[in-house]
Amino acid sequence: MSIQTDDFSEQRIIAATPASANEEAIERALRPKQLDEYVGQEKIRGQLEIFITAARQRHEALDHTLLFGPPGLGKTTLAHIIAREMGVNLRQTSGPVLERAGDLAALLTNLEANDVLFIDEIHRLSPVVEEILYPALEDYQIDIMIGEGPAARSVRLDLQPFTLVGATTRAGMLTNPLRDRFGIVARLEFYTPLELTKIVTRSSALLNAPIDEDGAFEIAKRSRGTPRIANRLLRRVRDYAEVKGNGKITKAMADAALVMLDVDPVGFDLMDRKLLEAVLFKFNGGPVGLDNLAAAIGEERDTIEDVLEPYLIQQGFLQRTPRGRIATPVAYAHFGVTAPQTGPNGDLWAGQ
């Protein structure tokens, strides 16, 4: 089952990126508005509650905050919650949009005291824009050039105190000077099935879709630890329940809908299984080089590296080695195949 777009990563129903502008609008309606409504990320939530309360009591801007982690885990949601809990406005933009220094200057000069500026994909800021940002973060001042040629001169503008909330899926791509200017740094982790069950239950109530606990858990455990995927699957299961049943989402109804969508009990879709089956059955468990694997399943090597592999490796189904990709005993068990006692790399699995 796929959502038809031009980008492979967005076609998959279990993709962690938004599939369309319409989906983003639905996501906004389902987002929690306050910290006490936010499910999961207990450590981060507890820290933010303290930092926000302290900043409010001192009537100061919250320290600049960096949120990083895989897509779909709630970085944008947390940025909106921070602004709402602080009782200030939120201005939202993204790194690729800020092409010129003037673009950033226009945003910064329009901020009111203690406002939140949220920059998504902050790792994609251009060096020119990033240089303008440094004095703004440290001293609440920016230097802009007025005029051209010999008549050009630098003017320093004072800014209102503000909070920058940066979000990125690739914290390693941030420059050290930018990373060092964040007082609060938080990594968002994947959610547990129980946390996702709570999210699915809450979202179903907002969507007026009756669901029982087993039905919510069935959706949650196939959502790859990601709320965005859980909410997307919930909407598709709701459609199925309304057409094929009485509208209530039960475990059996959720299972039938997800089977129809080609999402298996661990959250794999057709492409995940195709890749693993190629390693297991076409290359005897590996090792297999990336180019050979790409040719075997008819996908680009970049798609395999950036879209398909990360979740399989993270869940322990696939391993990267210097000689190529190999299937793990977990992958063999998932497909009901006996794993060799001695793997492709000698005694890797001996005794397991």
Curated annotation (Swiss-Prot):
So where does Mg(2+) get bound? Answer: 76
Cite the SUPFAM superfamilies for this sequence: P-loop containing nucleoside triphosphate hydrolases, Winged helix' DNA-binding domain
Q: What chemistry does it catalyse, as a reaction equation?
A: ATP + H2O = ADP + phosphate + H(+)
Q: Where is this region: Small ATPAse domain (RuvB-S)?
A: 192-262
Region Large ATPase domain (RuvB-L), residue ranges: 5-191
Q: Name one GO molecular function term.
A: ATP binding
**CDD domains annotated for this entry?**
AAA
Comment field on protein domains: Has 3 domains, the large (RuvB-L) and small ATPase (RuvB-S) domains and the C-terminal head (RuvB-H) domain. The head domain binds DNA, while the ATPase domains jointly bind ATP, ADP or are empty depending on the state of the subunit in the translocation cycle. During a single DNA translocation step the structure of each domain remains the same, but their relative positions change.
Family (UniProt): Belongs to the RuvB family.
Specify the protein name: Holliday junction branch migration complex subunit RuvB
- From which source organism is this entry? Janthinobacterium sp. (strain Marseille)
Taxonomic placement: Bacteria, Pseudomonadati, Pseudomonadota, Betaproteobacteria, Burkholderiales
Q: Which gene encodes it?
A: ruvB
